[in-house]
Amino acid sequence: MFASGARVAVGVSGGADSVCLLHALVELGGLKLSVLHVDHGLRGAESRADAEFVGELAARMGLPFCLREVTLGPGNVEQEGRRARLRFFHEQLAAGNCDRVALGHTRSDQAETVLFRFLRGSGTAGLAGIRPVTAEGIVRPLIELERAEIEEYLRERQIPWREDATNAGEEFARNRIRHGLLPQLAAEWNPALVETLAHTAEFARAEEAYWAGEIDRLSAESLTAGDGCVLIRTESLKALSLAVARRLVRRAIQMAKGDLRGVDFGHVERVVELASAPTGRGRTQVPGLDVRRSFEWLRLGVPFTRKPYSLKPLVPGTTQIPGTRNGISLELIEKSETSVLPWNVYNTEMGCLDWKRLAGSLELRNWRFGDQYQPMGLTGSEKIKTLFQLQRIPVWERAQWPVLTDGESIVWTRRFGPAAGFAAGPESGVVLKLGEVTIR
Amino acid sequence: MFASGARVAVGVSGGADSVCLLHALVELGGLKLSVLHVDHGLRGAESRADAEFVGELAARMGLPFCLREVTLGPGNVEQEGRRARLRFFHEQLAAGNCDRVALGHTRSDQAETVLFRFLRGSGTAGLAGIRPVTAEGIVRPLIELERAEIEEYLRERQIPWREDATNAGEEFARNRIRHGLLPQLAAEWNPALVETLAHTAEFARAEEAYWAGEIDRLSAESLTAGDGCVLIRTESLKALSLAVARRLVRRAIQMAKGDLRGVDFGHVERVVELASAPTGRGRTQVPGLDVRRSFEWLRLGVPFTRKPYSLKPLVPGTTQIPGTRNGISLELIEKSETSVLPWNVYNTEMGCLDWKRLAGSLELRNWRFGDQYQPMGLTGSEKIKTLFQLQRIPVWERAQWPVLTDGESIVWTRRFGPAAGFAAGPESGVVLKLGEVTIR
């Protein structure tokens, strides 16, 4: 949890757990201790008195004392308080003011957390409960002790602590579990329930650690971050066992929206089902995300919108496609230079147009429903939408799909290339060469 | 769950769930249905009436009816009843009397099971709850419906059912969950608790399916079945992530004792710790198993005992080592035959003795504490115990370790070979060649 000589800041509320922790760490010795306290100012004079109590305790022990006063945002007071404290502790660590922040959570807290999450339904991740050590540097040395043992320690040594009035109030879910449900379940079902739930957490924590490694590996293989979205090939998801697929989808959701807040079993399930459905389209919602299936792809992200554009392209030059990081480059090449441009280049996907056949009023715009033209190699005109279907282009890629027109005629579009009537050939004198580039 | 035309036997207790199931399957059509009923005879006339009710129902529907009367063993009546029913259903499947046995378990049963197991503390395996389909052929078509939906179905169709008196009794854990705890938790914590717990089960079931495959693969690699025991190399266990190591240990315990009854988190944990401890020895208990560490090995099995033996070995011939499937073969080879026995053979692990140097009173016995001799290559006499240490021979292998004596002298022992003073050499006329063989 900490090396000898480490600078350990102890979060002390003034309650039994954290007061015990502070005394125990002083007794242990060999650490550079300091005391942190957060005053939420929620209970007025009482809050003030807690802060003074902790300040005096630190002073008596000759330890540096750091008080943070916070004003809580609206919403769940219990949750907001917890977040404000964690934010403060993480700041202290990030600022290098200490090597570790030690908190007084006990096995009783662990059991309460696991029970609460079980009732809310939160898979193994939730059952893993409170972590004894976090990557950020928070440690919880009392996590294997029960609250009764803590109070015994304090009474034996006649160490005073403050009863937090909020700890008794039934309005907090935590207190209803602590004083109501947990003792009831222990009495009626399992006298060792606190220990049992701590084991459940420990088991789940190891499982989660295993999965984190597995899913890191798989997401590097199978998830692609796009513009404001994450893409998954449905085939790679279908190849996985259901448990792994579910976890990979959770990871994709987390990547796409930054967290997993509000995401439940049903959301994940519907995404997995969308990937396995035989039809290559469909849609489902995850809080904060739009999930679309198109052919072999799933897209998780903010809903994509069509941003119409109509530009005079630079010749020569590169014109950025609005709403994307791609640009269309246009270049004029004279006949005399054809030695560096073999004829077969005319048949590449990007293609070349015969400059003489163009009237010169070029427009670069996005694909529109109903667009049609005759690409080289086809015997007649075809709707671009049909070409999209044939080439399995996902719907979200179509929105900004570039089309080059000359007057009324489509002379080129991405992927399907030059129009048969405008394509450059051996007889062309001046060639307009098209390319697509990524703009950083 | 079942193919069209399948022969489906429906387990009907007479209660709402199973009566609903039977009607629903009749409605569904396309199946060859029959009705199974188990009478535990627990509630005398009432049990009888249940059986008659179900029999009459089957008759009215024109379905074959099979009644099994059982007498329950001592112990937990609820558990014994469940086991007796399952035994009967498995018999029916094994005998080929039906393709599937359909049971009336609902999502409400699922939630009760998950909650009960959570309170008892049973990792993901327990949280997986009731399986909708088992490998043996039991199916539970109502597993996604709640009990209220079942009763609605029956009331709408005015179908009567029997209220099982045992379902109301508070003496059964199941009933205390059904009528007490689950409604309380739903009211106080999560109105959708039954659904939440069903999802927990579904999630856990997929995880377990994944793990079953992983652990099958790993146990084929890392577990060795020995005489009444299972062996694991500690190195292969230490190389695994904790979650995987725990699951592999559970598998090893299951292999060694046939089931996992009575095995809890702490047992598994102590075995994993025994494997990771830096000292190469130690011991822990798992219900029904003795777990020993010796050097790089863990042995899980019935405690090994030393079975003393002292035999006149057959010359020539093979003598079985008592308590093992190994035998020591002794063979006499004349000088004239040395052409087929090159000299370097004398120096193999098994070795050869010079027949002339032996007084002839050979004894084959197990190693005794204090035994010592001078193997070839050592400059003096050495305790065999020291040689065991040097060669890292696990303690359980030492118990029946064979030693060959001639009068007072040890002339040979397994692995360490002939004694320097008795080993055959180029000058030997007649050679006693030793070998060890497996006896099937």
UniProtKB/Swiss-Prot annotation, chains A, B:
It holds the Pfam family TilS. It catalyses: cytidine(34) in tRNA(Ile2) + L-lysine + ATP = lysidine(34) in tRNA(Ile2) + AMP + diphosphate + H(+). The keyword Nucleotide-binding applies. CDD domains: TilS_N. It is an enzyme of class 6 (ligase). Its main location: cytoplasm. The keyword ATP-binding applies. Gene3D superfamilies: 1.20.59.20, HUPs. It is found in: Cytoplasm. Ligates lysine onto the cytidine present at position 34 of the AUA codon-specific tRNA(Ile) that contains the anticodon CAU, in an ATP-dependent manner. Cytidine is converted to lysidine, thus changing the amino acid specificity of the tRNA from methionine to isoleucine. The N-terminal region contains the highly conserved SGGXDS motif, predicted to be a P-loop motif involved in ATP binding. This is tRNA(Ile)-lysidine synthase. It comes from Solibacter usitatus (strain Ellin6076).
